[in-house]
Design a protein with these regions (language model features):
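Hydrophobic alpha-helical transmembrane segments of multi-pass integral membrane proteins
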Residues: 1-444
Length: 444
């Protein structure tokens, strides 16, 4: 009898037939799939409503007044928080709750903990957005939102750390797991800093806006300290299979994480130019370690998704390089707000969003009950629009904000609408996938 069957029988307290074991396992799988769909649907809601739509509204105001100061900093910070924590953060928690029991071959987590985590995380991110936009009772709700997010992550961490993998014959954890752990530490640091900043702002009582200098450093921690290592870790796990790459250079990936961590710490200390150089070295080493610029070992696995999937994955890492190069340029000149904004957008949309669009539409249908992606053509359409919109946004932000070309102000709302269409298509494609019947049910 298998180890899984033994655990199921131990929990039942009696000997079970093969059919009973299969039925128990099937019910657990369905419960985890429904939980994942809940997290992903919540992330899509944050992506579309407080994230993208508020961002479009901000750009329309900026374009019409031809100045970035026409929109309050709190609105911009609320938009960014909804995108980073409400969208991608919720995705990461959902995938973590679903996949970690699978990867470690153990019993699923107690679902009550996952539900409480979802409630706290969703409430925290929603309250953060509401206080940034409406400022109602912000001295109470701002630190409360940060406390909710921190508590949700601590519950998630407790669930993860409470389980141990079976002996697989390997010495120590796999390298991609170490990278994900580094990212989790970065997320914890981000949430702690966010909670401390919220308390400070609430006690001071002057404004709910983060000071510009601190906000710039905090964004480095959020993106490079938390999101980028997560992408690298999951890239190391999935890309060799999906793209047909040669085995990754594991030590090289750890070196990339080390260089990236030095860059983040240097940025938090205020040495921005040196920090961006370290970040550039990290992203370049990660491309080498993942072998993204090398010939593939075998054909890419594109069944169920568009065949252009590998192209967009590689283009995402190119956007990461562009983001750091723009950061070096911005740190070398004065009044470089437009260049900094373009650098952040190249990272958050060009790199991070493109990876979410690519990998998400590849794995989430299978995780949600072995479904098939609703439309590979919609996948291509969303990725093309996202790339075009990002290219327009990055170029127009530099040209307009830096005073190189006045006509570039009119490109900003165009880029925003294109990107809004892209995320809408992405969201619709996933939602239609979730409401469709899995192939097994169709056959029955």
């Amino acid at each position: 009898m298998s180890a899984l069957a033994t655990r199921v029988e131990n929990q039942a307290g009696r000997s079970l037939s093969a059919q009973e074991i299969f039925e128990i396992t099937r019910v657990r799988e369905q419960s985890l799939s429904r939980l994942l769909i809940l997290y992903i649907s919540t992330g899509l809601a944050f992506m579309l409503l407080p994230g993208t739509f508020l961002g479009v509204w901000n750009l329309l105001a900026i374009s019409s007044h031809r100045t970035a100061s026409s929109v309050s900093a709190s609105w911009i910070q609320a938009h960014g928080h909804a995108q980073i924590f409400g969208w991608i953060g919720t995705f990461i928690l959902g995938i973590g709750f679903y996949s970690i029991p699978k990867l470690r071959r153990m019993n699923p987590f107690a679902l009550w903990a996952a539900w409480i985590c979802w409630g706290l995380w969703t409430s925290g991110t929603a309250l953060r957005w509401l206080t940034g936009v409406y400022h109602w009772q912000w001295q109470v709700l701002l630190p409360l939102s940060a406390a909710f997010e921190l508590a949700a992550f601590l519950i998630f961490s407790k669930c993860v750390s409470g389980h141990r993998p079976q002996d697989s014959g390997k010495r120590g954890l796999e390298k991609w797991v170490l990278v994900v752990i580094t990212a989790a530490v970065g997320l914890l640091a981000t949430l702690l800093v966010n909670f401390g900043a919220a308390l400070f702002l609430a006690i001071r009582g002057a404004s709910s806006d983060l000071p510009p200098g601190f906000d710039q450093r905090f964004l480095v921690l959020e993106t490079w300290g938390f999101l980028v290592p997560f992408v690298w870790g999951f890239s190391a796990k999935w890309l060799p299979i999906f793209l047909g790459l040669r085995p990754i250079r594991e030590r090289g990936l750890l070196v990339a994480v080390g260089a990236n961590s030095i860059g983040v710490l240097t940025a938090m200390a205020g040495w921005i130019t040196l920090a961006v150089i370290w970040l550039l070295s990290g992203i370049c080493i990660s491309i080498w370690a993942l072998r993204l610029a090398e010939a593939r070992q075998q054909p890419a696995k594109t069944k169920g998704v568009h065949t252009s999937f590998p192209i967009f994955v590689r283009s995402a890492y190119l956007w990461g390089i562009i983001a750091t190069i723009l950061g070096i340029w911005a740190s070398a000149v004065r009044n470089s707000h437009g260049i900094w904004g373009a650098s952040r957008h190249a990272l958050t949309v060009g790199f991070l969003a493109t990876m979410v669009f690519s990998i998400g539409q590849r794995i989430l249908p299978a995780f949600s009950g072995m479904r098939l992606l609703f439309s590979s053509k919609l996948m291509l359409f969303s990725l093309l629009l996202l790339t075009i919109g990002c290219l327009l946004r990055v170029s127009s932000e530099i040209l307009a904000y830096q005073g190189f070309a006045g006509w570039a102000w009119s490109w900003l709302p165009v880029s925003a609408v294109i990107e809004m269409t892209a995320v809408t298509v992405f969201g619709v494609n996933l939602l239609l996938t979730f409401v469709s019947n899995p192939p097994s049910q169709v056959v029955q």
